[in-house]
């Protein structure tokens, strides 16, 4: 099955909640991770939200995050670099539950990190969704447009 693909604009409501696009929520239902039944991830499913170094937020389904979490858990607490990586990863991570309307709450810390106060752009990026403040995303895209061909040539 195809992952998350596409781009949508949504608004953060006055309580800091973000509506997950219906087409992305349908992907959860198809995968069985958001069927409305009680589970360890809440009645309507959950997402892992991570702050990123580029100023965006990444949203992962539990099944995707579990694979990443296993890799992180395998790092040694006795190796200073590996322990630092664990600390940095978990410091920027939250798990949030979807409500009946398909919204997730975003903490003030995460909203401030991403510069979000109103409208957002949600990009489907295969195994994750990336949430951007629109002007910040436009700045990244405009500032990198000349690099697209070189990057694509290098990796494809």
From Swiss-Prot:
Domain of life: Bacteria
Keyword Cell membrane: no
Major location (coarse): cytoplasm
Stored CDD domains: MraZ_C, MraZ_N
Pfam families: MraZ (PF02381)
Statement: the UniProt record of this protein carries the keyword Aminoacyl-tRNA synthetase: no
Recorded GO CC terms: cytoplasm; nucleoid
Subcellular localization, as worded in the UniProt entry: Cytoplasm, Nucleoid
Any GO MF annotation of the entry: DNA-binding transcription factor activity
Biological processes, Gene Ontology terms: negative regulation of DNA-templated transcription initiation
PROSITE patterns referenced in this protein's UniProt entry, alphabetically: SPOVT_ABRB
SpoVT-AbrB domain mapped to chain residues: 7-64, 93-136
Alphabetized UniProt keyword annotations: Cytoplasm, DNA-binding, Repeat, Transcription, Transcription regulation
Similarity comment: Belongs to the MraZ family.
Quaternary organization: Forms oligomers.
Protein name: Transcriptional regulator MraZ
Organism, as annotated: Chlorobium phaeovibrioides (strain DSM 265 / 1930)
This protein's encoding gene: mraZ
């Amino acid at each position: 099955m195809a992952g998350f693909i596409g781009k949508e604009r949504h608004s953060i409501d006055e309580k800091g909640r973000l509506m997950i696009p219906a087409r992305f929520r349908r992907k959860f239902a198809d995968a069985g991770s958001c069927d409305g039944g009680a589970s360890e991830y809440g009645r309507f499913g959950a997402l892992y939200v991570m702050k990123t170094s580029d100023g965006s937020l990444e949203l992962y389904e539990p099944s995707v995050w579990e694979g990443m979490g296993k890799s992180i858990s395998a790092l040694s607490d006795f190796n200073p670099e590996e322990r630092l990586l664990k600390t940095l990863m978990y410091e920027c991570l939250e798990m949030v539950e979807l409500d009946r309307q398909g919204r997730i709450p975003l903490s003030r810390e995460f909203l401030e990190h991403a510069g979000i106060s109103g409208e957002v752009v949600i990009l489907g990026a295969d195994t994750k969704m990336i949430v951007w403040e629109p002007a910040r995303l436009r700045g990244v895209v405009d500032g990198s447009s000349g690099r697209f061909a070189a990057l694509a040539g290098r990796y494809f």
